[in-house]
Swiss-Prot record:
Chief location category: cytoplasm
Era-type G domain location: 2-167
A biological process term (GO) from this entry: ribosomal small subunit assembly
SUPFAM superfamilies per record: P-loop containing nucleoside triphosphate hydrolases, Prokaryotic type KH domain (KH-domain type II)
Protein name stated in the entry: GTPase Era
Bilayer topology term: Peripheral membrane protein
A Pfam family: MMR_HSR1
Annotated region (G5), positions in chain: 146-148
Family affiliation: Belongs to the TRAFAC class TrmE-Era-EngA-EngB-Septin-like GTPase superfamily. Era GTPase family.
Length: 290
């Protein structure tokens, strides 16, 4: 019996959250084509044969001086020190310099390189990418081409990860799929709906706060506030006659209902907090409940 922690790291948009959801066969991590969508650590607990693999999905590694992005980078780096093995994820089309930058963090535990989205490339491109990474073969423990569309890739990956986990009793009940607070998952679903409905610049200065969750036998009542940094963005979130926020609410509700397996009544409000994303103390309170 083995049980241990795997940190999923890599640049933004490498597909880390999609991999986590596909391994779990359940959506708990926010997925977006926009960079740096993941803001909080999300974990997934996967039973593989008699072993328990606990994945930690972290914000993407990237260069940025913005306070919100720097806090997320710090969170990702901390997770590297708190795990048994690292899964470094790169898209087939990502530049290898991202891996070189990862190595500069001097990880102290074994790591596996996962080349994601290989279904988007031909064999020649894949072989070329593998050759680039093989220059660093003395650093990584394994390199695995991967596609979430190929079910057999899941077993290959889990078999490899388990090799580096310690012999240990289960950390969590085998029936659990995550220990991440439901509040964090739900607000990420709302944030994901915002990403899907608004232009590129708005989501990065927007945050979601869950104000109330009331669970009855057949229904969830959820009140949430969307925090905006400017009046103009607040207006765009609301939309003409409230059309945009209604659409955001509907899409978020469907996501939450699918995970919660019950009806959800979701009420969204919009609140102006100017430059909230530039205040580190405020960021820690909003993003990490500190």
């Amino acid at each position: 019996m083995k049980s241990g922690f795997v940190s999923i790291v890599g640049r933004t948009n490498a597909g880390k959250s999609s991999i986590l959801n596909s391994l779990l066969e359940e959506k708990i991590a926010m997925v977006s084509h926009k960079q740096n969508a993941t803001r909080r650590k999300i974990n997934a607990i996967i039973m593989h044969e008699k072993n328990q693999v606990i994945f930690i999905d972290t914000p993407g590694l990237h260069a940025s001086s913005k306070a919100i992005n720097q806090l997320m980078i710090d969170l990702a780096i901390k997770s590297i020190a708190d795990c048994d093995v690292i899964l470094f994820v790169a898209s087939i089309y990502d530049d290898i310099i991202d891996y070189e930058n990862f190595l500069k963090l001097n990880p102290k535990v074994p790591h596996i390189v996962l080349i994601n989205k290989v279904d988007l490339a031909d064999k020649k491109t894949l072989l070329s990418k593998l050759a680039q990474y093989n220059q660093f073969s003395s650093y990584f423990s394994a390199i695995i081409p991967y596609s979430i569309k190929q079910k057999f890739h899941k077993k290959i990956l889990l078999d490899e990860l388990v090799k580096y986990l310690p012999e240990h009793p289960y950390y969590f009940d085998p029936e659990f799929i995550t220990t991440t607070n439901e509040k964090d998952i739900y607000r990420d679903f709302i944030l994901e709906a915002i990403y899907e409905n608004l232009s590129d610049e708005i989501p990065y200065t927007t945050e979601v706060r869950i104000d109330k969750i009331k669970e009855l036998k057949t229904i969830y009542y959820i009140n949430a506030t969307i925090i905006s940094s400017t009046n103009s963005h607040k207006g765009m979130i609301l939309g003409k006659d409230g059309a945009t926020i209604k659409r955001i609410g509907k899409e978020a509700r469907v996501k939450i209902e699918k995970l919660a397996q019950k009806k959800v009544m979701l009420k969204l409000f919009v609140q102006l907090e100017k430059n909230w994303h530039k205040n580190e103390q405020n960021l820690k309170k909003i993003l990490y409940d500190e």
